[in-house]
Curated annotation (Swiss-Prot):
<dbReference type="GO" id="GO:0004869">
    <property type="term" value="F:cysteine-type endopeptidase inhibitor activity"/>
</dbReference>
<comment type="subunit">
    <text>Homodimer.</text>
</comment>
<comment type="similarity">
    <text>Belongs to the serpin family.</text>
</comment>
<keyword id="KW-0325">Glycoprotein</keyword>
<keyword id="KW-0722">Serine protease inhibitor</keyword>
<feature type="site" description="Reactive bond">
    <location>
        <begin position="377"/>
        <end position="378"/>
    </location>
</feature>
<dbReference type="InterPro" id="IPR000215">
    <property type="entry name" value="Serpin_fam"/>
</dbReference>
<feature type="signal peptide">
    <location>
        <begin position="1"/>
        <end position="24"/>
    </location>
</feature>
<dbReference type="GO" id="GO:0005615">
    <property type="term" value="C:extracellular space"/>
</dbReference>
<dbReference type="InterPro" id="IPR023796">
    <property type="entry name" value="Serpin_dom"/>
</dbReference>
<feature type="glycosylation site" description="N-linked (GlcNAc...) asparagine">
    <location>
        <position position="180"/>
    </location>
</feature>
<dbReference type="GO" id="GO:0004867">
    <property type="term" value="F:serine-type endopeptidase inhibitor activity"/>
</dbReference>
<comment type="function">
    <text>Potent inhibitor of the serine proteases elastase and trypsin. Moderately inhibits the serine proteases plasmin and chymotrypsin, and the thiol protease proenkephalin-processing enzyme. Does not inhibit the serine proteases cathepsin G, furin, kallikrein, thrombin, tissue plasminogen activator and urokinase, or the cysteine proteases cathepsin B, cathepsin L and papain.</text>
</comment>
<dbReference type="InterPro" id="IPR023795">
    <property type="entry name" value="Serpin_CS"/>
</dbReference>
<keyword id="KW-0646">Protease inhibitor</keyword>
<keyword id="KW-0732">Signal</keyword>
<protein>
    <recommendedName>
        <fullName>Serpin A3-1</fullName>
    </recommendedName>
</protein>
Length: 411
């Protein structure tokens, strides 16, 4: 093993706003779905558990700020990385992703992600969604044939030879790739690249959906959004009268409203009672989400007020992943399944998200909070203070975006 280890970066780019789906599986690769895989419920539960764990750490690190991420993008990228991990490094990654390795084999996990990627990239007239992976490889770096094959077949990954010694040119190449795949929403995923970088893995998600019941722009007006007890901002507030799934959770002290897209996927808006945000965040679990979804019932909302906004985020996840138990990849990694030698170490995990909400629907993700007023005959929902949002794909029960909107006026 060399005394000085070379850099390996994991990037997570995501977005919304697009015109077409992108299919990354090479045309010459025929996949036969004959392998055992984790059942859909188990994969969704593990991904949801990881999603909430990741969100909680980001919320702690970014108090009183907007928090927007795609936990699915992070899960896919780490699972992709685990293809080349060995020993305790592999165990840390998979257990960090909330898989019980006494019940599930590594091979089953990879085939489950393969199946998920294929399902997500199915063409649809109602939804613009594509998920893809890419490898940027130092020109003289020799990857193992097994890793290249598994990356293509299981994770639909593209590969690009890259000269990282010219770090600015390499940075531009990767940022331009992500910008193109996200229709310009993620413009600068990497702000810096070391000349010692050998390999960069990128995952992106592109998502755009239309509300099943769109808002009328003529009814959008400026209104107050209460960021905190002593801060109020003006935001464009959309309004709508509709029947939609609703649940009042007395046990956890929150109100939920679900808005569906034409694809029947949905955005779940969650408003904790005054002073209950931290308590609610602490109780976010897969079981909580399942209970909420089973409890939602159609109700007539006579006046729904929802802010129109566009926000972005960019996170370095090294410390947060370490808090979740994924540590060895940053210091004492065994990633010998990539090159055959254990001299690669992950130097940076970067995650970027861009989210837009308007009268037509969601680009990237939607974020809104819910404040509710109720009379005997009328339900009025005012999205006018901090709230949580989860965008869930119906067929796979995958949370593609998760966040907290504290101030919708901040880009």
């Amino acid at each position: 093993m060399r005394a000085e280890r070379t850099s390996f970066l994991l990037a997570l780019g995501l977005l919304v706003a697009g015109i077409r789906s992108v299919h990354c599986l090479p045309e010459n690769v025929v996949v036969k779905d004959q392998h055992r895989r984790v059942d859909g419920h188990t994969l969704a539960s593990s991904n949801t558990d990881f999603a909430f764990s990741l969100y909680k750490q980001l919320a702690l690190k970014n108090p009183n700020k907007n928090v927007i991420l795609s936990p699915l993008s992070v899960s896919i990228a780490l699972a992709f990385l685990s293809l080349g991990a060995r020993g305790s490094t592999l165990t840390e990654i998979l257990e960090g992703l909330k898989f019980n390795l006494t019940e599930i084999q590594e091979k089953e996990i990879h085939h489950s992600f393969q199946h998920l990627l294929q399902a997500l990239n199915q063409p649809s007239n109602q939804l613009q969604l594509s998920v893809g992976n890419a490898m940027f490889v130092q020109e003289e770096l020799k990857l193992l044939d097994k890793f290249i094959e598994d990356a293509q077949v299981l994770y639909s990954s593209e590969a690009f030879p890259t000269n990282f010694r010219d770090s600015e040119a390499a940075r531009s190449l990767i940022n331009d790739y992500v910008k193109n795949k996200t229709q310009g929403k993620i413009e600068e995923l990497f702000k810096y690249l070391s000349p010692r970088t050998e390999l960069v893995l990128v995952n992106y998600i592109y998502f755009k959906a239309q509300w099943k019941t769109p808002f009328d722009p003529k009814h959008t007006e400026q209104a107050e959004f209460h960021v905190s007890d002593n801060k109020t901002v003006e935001v464009p507030m959309m309004t709508l009268d509709l029947e939609t799934p609703y649940f009042r959770d007395e046990e956890l002290g929150c109100t939920l409203v679900e808005l569906t897209y034409t694809s029947n996927d949905s955005a779940l808006f969650i408003l904790p009672d005054e002073g209950k945000m931290r308590d609610l965040e602490a109780k976010l679990t897969p079981e909580t989400l399942t209970r909420w979804r089973n409890s939602l019932q159609p109700r007539r909302i006579h006046e729904l007020y929802l802010p129109k906004f566009s926000i972005k985020s960019n996170y370095e996840l090294n410390d947060i992943l370490s808090q979740l138990g994924i540590r060895k990849i940053f210091a004492n990694a065994d990633l010998s399944g990539i090159t055959g030698t254990a001299d690669l170490v992950v130097s940076q995990v970067v995650h970027g998200a861009a989210l837009d909400v308007d009268e037509e629907g969601t680009e990237g993700a939607a974020a809104t909070g819910i404040s509710m007023e109720r009379t005997i005959l009328r339900i009025i929902v005012r999205v006018n203070r901090p709230f949580l949002i989860a965008i869930v794909l119906k067929d796979t029960q995958s949370i593609i975006f998760l966040g907290k909107v504290t101030n919708p006026s901040e880009a």
